Amino acid sequence: MIAAQFRIQALPTTYLFKEAQALDAFPSVLDKSSLIQRLSIILPKEEDLKFQQALDFLQVENYEAALPLLKDAWELSDKKNSDVALLYAETYIAMKKTEPAQEILNQIPLQDRDSRWHGLQAQIELQIQAADTPEIQQLQADYAKNPTAEIAIKLAVQLHQAGRNEEALTLLFGILKTDLGAQNGEVKQQFLSILSAMGNADPLTNKFRRLLYSLLY
């Protein structure tokens, strides 16, 4: 009866089902590569699974757990899935981390920069304005008059606390390029501390880590 229902002509015959619907069938036994190829059509992509997992975390505002999943999903799509990229950037914005969000938005193709992209860009600009504290402004003025490593460290700390990590790291790296042991190694230590606080999910981390390695090696 089953053989008649599924029109099985020979044994063995394999059927592939999804949600109680037969999607594919083939007689005899397939080799591993052929089976994987057929299954890839039916099974969800790894990037989609990670994206869905990230959505579950975002629903409960667990941004830290969602970030690496969104990063993996975006990279698995070869950074071509702009919907994933937008949510990745939006998550950073929700955490008030504008620089990695901007880094992601910059990589989205022009044809995909829709109203949502522009909305996120506007949110970034507002957060940057809010993060320009009087303390930062004063230290910037002090550093412009007297560009010492000591003032640079204080300014970098304030920038980091305001979520302006790229500015902080760029400032410190400019000093490290000329003197890797500046301020008895404190500049390098502060540079590494900021990188550590940013975490590996931040797209800026690897960028500045590579720059530091270029000086060390």
Swiss-Prot record:
InterPro entries: TPR-like_helical_dom_sf. SUPFAM superfamilies: TPR-like. Pfam families: TPR_19 (PF14559), TPR_20 (PF14561). It comes from the Bacteria. This is Uncharacterized protein HI_1159. It comes from Haemophilus influenzae (strain ATCC 51907 / DSM 11121 / KW20 / Rd).
